[in-house]
Amino acid sequence: MEKTAVLLVNLGTPSAPEPDAVRPYLAEFLGDWWVIDKPRWQWLPILHGIILRVRPPRVAKIYQKIWLPEGSPLLHYSRLQQAALQQRLEPEGIRVALGMTYGQPSVKSALEELRGWGVRRLLVLPLFPQYSSTTTAAVWSKVQKALDGWRDLPEQIFIRDFPTHPKYLAFLTERISGYIAEKGRPDALVLSYHSIPQAYTASGDDYAAQCESTTDAVRDRFPDLKIVMGYQSKFGNDPWLEPATDEVLRELVRTGHRHVAVMAPGFAADCIETLHELEVEYAEEFVKAGGERYDYLPAANDHPLFIDCLEDLVRRHLPR
């Protein structure tokens, strides 16, 4: 079989929980048109003149609270996913590489490594279950730019999404069932997804529909459990997808729901948005509003059922 490789891609992370490391990461991330599509002449002066002066120290302090002995949580868990999938695919001689859309290891460096190995068939697997132009399309763009100039282009297979993949849903089901068995049934389960600007969905991004399809599939598996969804991590003043997760939580308290469990099905690996925004900030707000118990259910990370999903996504694209 021709040399086949899988490139796993997640969003990215600063190299250290310090302002000087956060600043270039945010510059690359927020400077990407796929993320913020405002005219460059309008947006870049705001980004470099205000945001990159103010936000890095604040963001660095948050990273310091969640940083692991192994380093960045997102990178650590992504490497565990890479290693677990590599072990599954090793017998077929398939190599698994890891790249980040922003920061290191970059998509370009991962592809250069695979080029040196002699890759002839490349499967790109963005670690975003629900497609969005802000994430998945950004991966596509990075891959094409990195391959620009290669005279020995490999065959490319790009896996767009997997919002209702049976093995992905099996992981979500097991995570929720395990929680209920250990901690008891919550008054409500909140599924929180990263928000995006409403203008993006209006222009064709089907992210919201995919988030709803994942939520509906989870509801089908737990018909007796109250399940609501929300969107988190809004940035800027433009209208973003709603309802906001923090408002959903406040409304649950107002309607007598004192015990909630919160899960983020759109995040394949725990990161700043889950480990701090969801697990810490929203928990504090929930209790302050009158809630009594708030539990965050961890992301997939290297859970075997999620690795089953990644393996299946790869194997279905291999030659028979």
UniProtKB/Swiss-Prot annotation:
Keyword annotations from UniProtKB, A to Z: Cytoplasm, Heme biosynthesis, Iron, Lyase, Metal-binding, Porphyrin biosynthesis
Transmembrane helix keyword on record: no
The keyword Membrane is assigned to this record: no
UniProt pathway annotation: Porphyrin-containing compound metabolism; protoheme biosynthesis
CDD domains: Ferrochelatase_C, Ferrochelatase_N
Compartment list: Cytoplasm
Gene Ontology terms describing biological process: heme biosynthetic process
Enzyme Commission (EC) number: 4.99.1.9
GO cellular component: a single term: cytoplasm
Listed InterPro entries: Ferrochelatase (IPR001015), Ferrochelatase_AS (IPR019772), Ferrochelatase_C (IPR033644), Ferrochelatase_N (IPR033659)
One Pfam family from the record: Ferrochelatase
UniProt-listed HAMAP family: Ferrochelatase
Family to which this protein belongs: Belongs to the ferrochelatase family.
The protein's role, per its UniProt record: Involved in coproporphyrin-dependent heme b biosynthesis. Catalyzes the insertion of ferrous iron into coproporphyrin III to form Fe-coproporphyrin III.
Protein name: Coproporphyrin III ferrochelatase
Gene: cpfC
